A protein has these predicted regions:
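Conserved catalytic or regulatory cores that recognize and/or transform ribose-phosphate-containing ligands
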Residues: 1-161
């Protein structure tokens, strides 16, 4: 797939493993929303990482694999999952948004935060790259390091007595 084919290439950065116990739901949420995008958008090739998720891969494995694609220079639309995307996806599945998903977006994910850094870096050398979704400043508001397999859990007050 190249930009020369006449199709736009979109990468969809979404929550996969950042909500403990919700990986299967996260994959359904992403797949449902991307399917609706594919039905609505003409001549757009959408890369959905949820379609390629392999249980057992850790965050480093996943980031290494996707960074190769992300730095290829072939992406011209980089969409980060918004709260509205998540709400629309649950609606398409005929479900209400559960409390654990309420208010979430790509900024909740350490993987998506790293991907935003990559997207901004790529945009410097490819100024035509469109970045869609929550603004970059929202990704970088947290300085906490993720703890666990690939979840965004943090140890709070660990050094306080």
């Amino acid at each position: 797939m190249t930009k020369d084919s006449g199709k736009a290439v979109m990468f969809y950065s979404c929550i996969i493993g950042s909500i403990p116990g919700q990986t299967a739901t996260a994959i359904k949420v992403a797949d449902t929303f991307v399917r609706s995008l594919r039905e609505r958008l003409d001549q757009v090739f959408i890369i959905n990482p949820a379609e390629y998720f392999e249980p057992g891969m850790d965050g480093d494995d996943l980031m290494f694999m996707w960074e190769q694609v992300q730095r290829s220079g072939l992406i011209n639309i980089w969409r980060f999952q918004s709260m509205e995307d998540i709400e629309a996806s649950f609606g398409l599945m005929g479900l209400k948004v559960p409390p654990v998903w309420s208010g979430k977006d790509a900024t909740f994910s350490t993987g998506c935060t790293k991907e935003m850094r990559i997207a901004l870096d790529m945009q410097r050398s490819h100024p035509e790259l469109q970045i869609v979704g929550p603004g970059p400043e929202k990704f970088f508001r947290r300085g906490d390091y993720g703890v666990g397999k690939f979840f965004d859990a943090t140890i709070s007050n660990a050094n306080q007595e």
